[in-house]
Structure formats: structure tokens, C-alpha cells
Regions:
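A generic local structural motif
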Residues: 15-19, 92-93, 122
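Short clusters of hydrophobic/aromatic residues that line enzyme substrate/ligand-binding pockets
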Residues: 6, 10, 47, 123
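Short C-terminal domain-edge/linker segments immediately following a structured domain
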Residues: 12-21, 60-66, 131-139
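His/Asp/Glu-enriched, well-ordered alpha-helical/loop segment
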Residues: 22-107
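Short capping/connector residues at structural and topological boundaries
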Residues: 9-11, 15, 52, 119, ...
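C-terminal cap of metal-dependent C-N hydrolases
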Residues: 49, 101-144
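Histidine/acidic residue-rich metal-binding segments in metalloenzymes
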Residues: 1-31
Length: 144
């Protein structure tokens, strides 16, 4: 299945469990994604000829929620994808306050919302529980 051709490659169940354990016990500080959406032609071909990649930014939260939905796991996930990368790169903390410009991602909790801009984003048989639907940054609202 060319939708599953990613780099780095998808890992075994044992590796996935180790990653979750590392996130929960603090061994893993930061989670990043290689957001690399592909067009139809790049994925509708033989596996060996298919390009590596899939859209991950708007899907990663839904994939996460389909697997781990408790509050502690959510707090650790948000810390690893949002707060800790900002600390690493010495970026200021974001806060929602009167007079501040918003800098945030908007998520929808309802189902998989499978409207996609590329076929690479539509990875078959991966359950989702919501996804990012937009961002607010620099006084602009961007719908995904």
C-alpha cells in the first residue's frame, strides 16, 4: 500500500509501544512530524516507484486521540508537540490574553473529517478521532 510508504518507515507495534512509554515517562521530550503530502500521481503507482510521504500535520492529533484519550496522555502530547519545541528554539510562550495576538491551532473532535487536499493524507485503515481544521497566526485565520 503506497499510502504507507513513509520516511522514516512505520514501526512495529513493539516500537510504537516503546515510543508511547517514552513519551509518558518523560524520556521523549519532543515529537515532530515529517509533513510531506504527496499528490495523486506520486502515490497511485507501484510501491517501489511511489514517493515517500504523507500529510501529517492536520492528522497527527486525530491519530493520537484514536490511541490515547486520557488527560495525562493529552497533556504530555501537547507538551511534546507544542511547548517543548518552543523552549528548544528559545521562542516565547504563547498565551491567550486580551490584547495579545492569537497563535494557535483549531481542532475538531468529531470523527475523522476525511476531507483532504492530497491523497497522501488519506491513509487507509488509520482510525482518527478529530483533526486540525485551522490555525490562527499573525492576525490571519487559515483553514486546513
Amino acid at each position: 500500500d503506497t499510502y504507507l510508504k513513509t520516511l522514516p518507515p512505520l514501526r512495529s507495534k513493539s516500537d510504537q509501544k516503546s515510543l508511547w512509554d517514552g513519551l509518558m515517562d518523560g524520556t521523549i521530550d519532543i515529537i515532530a512530524s515529517d509533513h510531506n503530502p504527496m499528490d495523486i500521481e506520486s502515490k497511485r503507482c507501484e510501491f517501489g516507484k511511489a514517493e515517500f510521504g504523507t500529510a501529517t500535520i492536520e492528522n497527527s492529533f486525530g491519530w493520537y486521540r484514536a490511541k490515547k484519550a486520557n488527560q495525562r496522555a493529552l497533556d504530555r502530547w501537547v507538551e511534546a508537540v507544542a511547548h517543548n519545541p518552543r523552549k528548544l528554539f528559545n521562542l516565547k510562550d504563547c498565551s491567550i490574553d486580551i490584547g495579545n495576538y492569537a497563535d494557535l491551532t483549531i481542532f475538531a473532535n468529531d470523527g475523522s473529517l476525511i476531507e483532504k487536499k492530497t491523497l497522501g493524507a488519506n491513509v487507509p485503515n488509520w482510525n482518527q478521532n478529530g483533526r486540525a481544521i485551522g490555525i490562527i497566526n499573525n492576525k490571519k485565520i487559515i483553514q486546513l
